Amino acid sequence: IEKRVKETPNATWPVHAVVTNSTYDGLFYNTGFIKNTLDVKSIHFDSAWVPYTNFSPIYQGLAGMSGGRTEGKVIYETQSTHKLLAAFSQASMIHVKGEINEATFNEAFMMHTSTSPFYPIVASTETAAAMMRGNVGRRLIDESIDRAIRFRKEIKRLREESDSWFFD
């Protein structure tokens, strides 16, 4: 980035960065490191595939909203709630940590939203949030992780016992 800024006439240092976290195939970044070292005023973590990260300690430090505020920065995290939590298709959330100008934020938000919202989508985000509130949300995520681990172990066991082409 520094090289490109220097090579570009009239360019100034960026003030905003967008980081895809996690990637579609499950790659997470150390968001604490990014927040503390990336020299920009605001960072947007596009966390479309991982709206569940704040509900399990195994993801601590891997989500945009992990940890406290970052001095002098605004952190945004967007999540496609419909992908992995119980919300209707197209439902998503924007999380903000840090000091923002609410009028400017709301103006930008309203520019990209409908004047005729489909209220069942809005209600489904509220329902998804309520389902994940407190210990219930943590328990749901813990059970999902436990099932995924058991499934992987069972597939591994079946592969070790099989001569079938299915596992090749």
Where are these regions (language model features)?
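Conserved PLP-enzyme active-site core in the AAT-like
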Residues: 1-159, 163
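Low-complexity, serine/threonine/proline-enriched polar segments
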Residues: 166-168
